[in-house]
Amino acid sequence: MKPEEFEVYVIPPNFMEGGTLFGGLLKTRNTIEAVILGLAVGVPVLHLPFSLTVRVVILCLTALPLVLLALIGVSGMSLSAFIRLFFCFLHNRRILSRDGTQGGKNGKTLLPSWAQQKKSDCEAEDPPLPKSRSRFSVDLKQRSVTQFKTFLQEEEAVQPLNALADYIPIEKIEHGVIYTRDHRYVKVVEVVPVNFLLRSAREQRSIIYSFISYLKIAPVKVQFKALTKRADINRHLDTVRRELEHEQDPRCRVLQEDYLKLIRQLGSREAITRRFFLVFEYEPLPGTKRGHEEEDAIASLQTAARTAANYLRQCGNEVISPENEDDATAEILYNILCRKASSEPFYQRVKSVLADYMASGRDINAIPVNEFYAPDSIDLTHGNYLCVDGLYYAYLLVPSDGYKARVPAGWLSLLVNAGDGIDLDVFLARQPKDRMVRKLGQQLRINRSKIKETSDTNTDFDDLDGAIRSGYFLKDGLSNNEDFYYLNLLITVTAGSVDDLEWKVAEMKKLLLSQDMDVQTCSFCQEQAFLSSLPLVSLERQLYERSKRNVLTTGAASCYPFTSYEMCDDNGILLGVNKHNNSLIIVDIFDSRVYKNANIAILGTSGAGKTFTLQLMALRMRRKGIQVFIIAPLKGHEFHRACSNIGGQFISISPASQNCINIMEIRKADKSVDDLLDGPGAEKSLLAAKIQRLHTFFSLLIPDMSHEERQLLDDAMICTYGVKGITHDNASLEQPKNPGCYKEMPILGDLYEILAASPETKRLANILNRLVNGSARSFNQQTNVALDNKYIVLDISELTGDLLTVGMFVALDFVWDKAKENRTAEKAIFVDECWQLIGASSNRQAAESVLELAKTIRGYGGSLVCATQDLNDFFALDDGKYGKGIINNSKTKILLNLEEEEAQRVQGVLHLSEAELMEITHFERGSALISTNNNNIAVEIKCSQMEKELITTDRRELAELAQRAAPKQHPC
């Protein structure tokens, strides 16, 4: 197989259908029921005193439909089983409420049958021996089952305030383990997904093979749960509100309030989040001492969790390790059982429960754990759905014959990413290999004997042939060290109304039908499906039999579910919405625990939206209080509107501008943070450091400078500073009468006079004359702009030729000085059209300066964000040394639309797959591919109307802005 070919996996038909006739065409039970119904209705009809024709017509209208219905069955069940299920539903339908007053008809109990049995058993036993518990545990009554035996101090059992707490089949939570009422131990761990769909074929194969390794050593029964719901943006909103409180500039406060509105809008309409859980139960080993089973279960489950973390890490997944496992498990159950109420944080729910118990005078140390995540009401009176706290649930399952036989890796992404309110539960149960090999051999012999008696024109032939092929496939796999599993899929659909629920169910059926899959509604067994969907690895028996499908280890691994990657850092900035799963992309590039560095490279063709994306990020960083510098070598006017509207400082560096940053100025640096962190260090000469950077400046201005001239220039610069009383002693920088303030700095004109005075440096003076007395004399001034603003734009777009690289160096020199001032403060340097500085037309020393900035800015708590469009020029200088260096030192890359040639050029550098290459060449404006931490995410950039008006460069939109602004300026 070629590296870029995606592998196909096989999910064979069930090789063994017990109780079937005619090669699996009819089920034995259905056939018997059809015969009984046919005789029960047909015999009396045949004895009616009518003509034969009339009796045949009556038979066709009565017996025939019943016989066909019995043969076909209902929802995958026999007619008798369905009728029994229907009457059981009628008998058990009820409304469960918090106060316990609303039961079913005739005053039926609120508890399910298993709970009623447990209650009666407990009443029949000896008086209970109450036990103490931790915060998240409940009392266990004395029972004969020793696996729940504990040795804790006794205390009285507590009746919960919420009657539904008794409905949940959980006894307690201790040591991060769920103790169920049916005497099992269950562990739930949360798994961070990877962006599987945008991985290359080779990477996908690697993930699947690693997942195969895990499945082979995983517990016998595992459940994978994908929970989908509206994103909880409250923590991010709280962060934004705190930043708003600390903001002093009124114009920036307006921007922050606008950002809050945008987040709320996206959160209510589009933002979806997914959480993934791995659930497994304890399987006692033969010979385990029953008296120590609880201790063995806890140790075994904790070991299994660590093993899962190690193996899933090889797949690229991380298993979340909470500080308090009991709290984390309860929070997971809260989000599953109280979907509507879970918009309120779990700690608020805990406070509410504690307040209720205190108000009722109850002991808060004896609160049953189920109180913290029990819903307030469950309506079980409908056959096709149930209602929990006003939210409607419907359950679907994929029947045994509803699976595709050949599937790609990660095919469950279709269901995982289906949309808001669509949850998926995957159940895998490994079967004993010896027993399955024996059954396979028996069934193969039976099927081979049947097919010999069947004509190849018979409808049974294909079914038998498929069963035989499936049997041989499974047998070969088992002989090649694969394991045998039964796979079950249960789909949860939730909606705010019955109409929405029915629409979602219909759409899910269409979606699966389009993929050649079948799905059935769990009619009249919604309660069983609801309990099965809990993370307890407990699929109800009837649902299990209806939906089980045999798979080998490779087929089970193709169901790899952790495929919907999200980037949502509460302390970050919004970039947009994930195009594949509608999750919000909120990135905190300064979080060193997640990102090795904060650098970003933005690549795109002309008109793809590079400048728009760059400015959007800059505005949102400024909104967070981060120091922002923008260097604009082209079209600097595009940055002016946003800068002036948020209180920024716009500095134009050009011969025609009055603004000037003195290139020879030694700026005062705040070393207090360095002294606090590292202690007082050896003093370094600020003059020597400045002169070293000035040498780079003059090498840009005079590329053909000889070594002798460079030495003479060095002497002249030292002399120039000496005239101002500045030496290598840093104390000489300060004014004697005003300590803490620096002396007046020399300007280029002072250096020019010294160079012009010597014949040996006359040539250097003549070249420098352009910046002193010529057309570019604006460079020959003291700094006359405020350099302490939080948002500074350095416009060098009016510089051309050699002055462009000179101006770029002036800008970089300034921002580099500012970046070094405080290592603990976050700052971001944006360089638009970076190819101008490191491209073929640039100078190696200038390119080295940018590359050095990219390599070292991390050490000063900063970020370098480079945007470029001319990729050929970007990778031109020194065979792409500088372009590749910047790309390699940027942990995050944002790819906008690229032309075919540019995309192929960047494919090798970024290791893009063919699918990703195709995607970025077809991006529309506003779409991007974010590549970070080995995950590639297609995102739709989102901005508010205010942000769009501040940074748009589109001609039509600018014309509309000008039209709206005209009446304000000319009211008459």
Predicted regions and their residues:
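Short, charged cytosolic
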Residues: 1-14
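Extended, folded cores of ATP/NTP-driven motor/assembly subunits in large transport
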Residues: 59-561
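Conserved P-loop NTPase
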Residues: 912-966
